[in-house]
């Protein structure tokens, strides 16, 4: 996606099918266990994994004005109330600030950050990034889910902070969030068709870039870009 305009430049879903023979293939397509007709880019709902650490970082920045002073010593894992979260490959990252934690994709540090966040504020930030909400899309899509409230356990928060737990998102939605960060916090309305021509080759309709919504401040976006 071109962040400054909203143009969708590429979209892929596997397994695929041949649209030229869809009539002949319809029976097996509709019974295919691999769901070839499902556009996984927009309709797939997956745990976001470490990409969600951007959301956790944003919430921490909003709650703690001194976020640049964050410090954590990673020993490859963190244990809290019986729940242990390991870093990938059991790697110990040592002393980290917030930028280091994101660069290292440190699960221990982000689990620690998750425990420091206000749950309702965390949910509000996620919803400002269009979780639990409609997405700008002309294609069928799955609504992303963020399930955190005052009753969410610390164990669940630790998992949520690193992109696991009950959180679900489509690749398309994660692209929208990333594009907004790249575009200074502003999400442009995505579109697939640049323009439409009639049989003479005359342009009868042209899509132009249009702001959809501001998801974060330009300062927040700039800091996330710096950390990325």
Report the location of each language-model feature.
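Beta-lactam-recognizing serine transpeptidase/beta-lactamase-like catalytic domain environment
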Residues: 2-50, 55-228
């Amino acid at each position: 996606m071109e962040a400054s305009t909203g143009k969708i430049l590429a979209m892929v879903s596997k397994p695929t099918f041949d649209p030229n023979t869809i009539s002949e293939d319809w029976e097996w397509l509709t019974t295919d266990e691999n769901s070839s007709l499902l556009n996984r880019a927009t309709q797939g709902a997956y745990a976001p994994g470490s990409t969600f650490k951007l959301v956790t970082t944003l919430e921490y920045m909003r709650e703690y004005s001194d976020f640049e002073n964050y410090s954590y010593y990673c020993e490859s894992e963190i244990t809290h109330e019986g729940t242990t979260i390991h870093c990938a490959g059991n790697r110990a990252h040592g002393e980290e600030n917030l930028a280091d934690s994101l660069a290292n994709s440190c699960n221990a540090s982000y689990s620690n950050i998750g425990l420091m966040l206000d749950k309702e504020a965390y949910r509000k930030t996620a919803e400002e990034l269009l979780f639990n909400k409609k997405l700008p899309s002309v294609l069928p899509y799955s609504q992303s889910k963020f399930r955190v409230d005052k009753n969410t356990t610390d164990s669940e928060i630790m998992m949520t902070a690193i992109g696991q737990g009950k959180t679900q998102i489509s690749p398309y939605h994660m692209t929208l969030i990333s594009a907004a960060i790249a575009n200074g916090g502003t999400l442009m309305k995505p579109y697939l068709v640049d323009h439409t021509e009639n049989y003479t080759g005359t342009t009868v309709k042209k899509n132009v870039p249009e702001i959809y919504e501001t998801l974060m401040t330009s300062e927040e976006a700039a800091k996330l870009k710096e950390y990325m």
